[in-house]
């Protein structure tokens, strides 16, 4: 993205990776650079410009593909593994902004994705509060703010939290789960 506002900024890179339920990556994924709209690169803020310069992405803008072509390729890639609409969640780290950009600029892709998201940053924040030992030992990230590297690091991070924070096995029995649910009362205001 050239910034965080989908009304004035644009997508400049998109990637996707499909995993199975155990977070095993099924193939190398897809990673595309999108040619920015005229004027958006010049209008980028200093922070974003430095980030895209340091990562090398800014040097790839001119050879990027059209936004519609990028949407079609990503959608084709996802449908190869998940042909049914509304079943594939968007997943990654701090993906609220990603979802807004996809909704605005890639409506067919947005329509194919499930409305629910899997945001690793939520798990990270809960772990920081409830399981700080696990949080502070989490794998360090160094994706350099490139889409595919960020996705792969998010998958590794989610694998880590799954093993270090979430209950191993199938979880509580139905009876235990029901007893837990019955024991939790929300304070009334």
Write out the residue ranges for each language-model feature.
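Substrate-recognition/cap helix-loop segment adjacent to the acidic, metal-dependent catalytic center
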Residues: 80-82, 97-116
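Acidic active-site catalytic centers that drive phospho-/nucleotidyl reactions
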Residues: 13, 20, 98, 119, ...
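Acidic two-metal-ion nuclease catalytic site recognized across multiple nuclease folds
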Residues: 141, 145-189
């Amino acid at each position: 993205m050239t910034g965080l506002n989908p009304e004035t900024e644009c997508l400049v890179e998109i990637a996707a990776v499909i995993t199975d339920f155990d977070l095993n990556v099924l193939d190398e994924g897809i990673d595309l650079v999108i040619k920015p709209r005229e004027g958006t690169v010049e209008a980028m803020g200093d922070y974003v410009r430095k980030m895209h310069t340091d990562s090398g992405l800014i040097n790839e803008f001119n050879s990027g593909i059209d936004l519609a072509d990028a949407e079609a390729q990503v959608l084709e890639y996802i449908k190869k593994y998940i042909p049914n609409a509304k079943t594939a969640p968007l997943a990654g780290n701090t993906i609220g902004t990603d979802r807004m950009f996809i909704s605005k600029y890639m409506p067919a892709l947005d329509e194919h994705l499930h409305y629910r998201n899997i945001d690793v940053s939520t798990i990270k924040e809960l772990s920081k509060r409830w399981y700080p030992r696990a949080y502070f030992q989490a794998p360090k990230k160094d994706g350099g703010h490139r889409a595919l590297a960020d996705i792969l690091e998010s998958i590794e991070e989610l694998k880590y939290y799954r093993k270090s924070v979430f209950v191993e096995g199938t979880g509580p029995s139905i009876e235990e789960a029901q007893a837990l649910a019955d024991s939790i009362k929300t304070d009334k205001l």
